[in-house]
Amino acid sequence: MKVNLKRAAISGIIGEIAYFISMMLFLITHTNFALTLWESMTVIGAIVMLIAFLVIADEFKIKPLLRRLMTISLSGTVFLTSVAHCTSIGVIRKLESQGTTVPDYFKIGAFPSIEMTIDYVAWGFFMGADFITLFLGIKDKAIRIFSVTCGILCLCGFIGSFFSDSLWYIAPLGYGIGFLIMCIFILKRKEAK
């Protein structure tokens, strides 16, 4: 079954909202269940974004070379974030529940940390590259503005993380808030036609 643009936009919106709800749940409760939910939604969200971006690329007839580059960068995001979060859920927290002391530099959410670096590469570098390839390959002016803005935010957050952990938080404005706004915009435009 081919996913159309409206369904992709709705999926993107639902995925982002579910992600933000899971994040808020963890920030409020600080429970292992909420953290597992948040990490699971991060992986699921990456897959939803991959599908949504590929549908957008098809609908707006992005050039084949740029579509391939986009697919590679999206796959990088999905693969790396899956490695980071599945390692956190399946290894790190299991070791901790067994009483093993795991150094912070192996934990997601700690800085500096191996898992956070993997996630920063996934969401900062590869997702930034994805937005930039969309910008380069699409003719629609509004989507170009959204995509270049989101791409720059992701890449600035990625580069900023080398200097300070707090500079990383520029990136979620691109892949989180920006992607949500872009999906809402696409949905509203699709409904107006």
Task: Give the predicted meaning of each segment.
Residues 1-193:
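Hydrophobic, aromatic-enriched alpha-helical segments typical of multi-pass transmembrane helices
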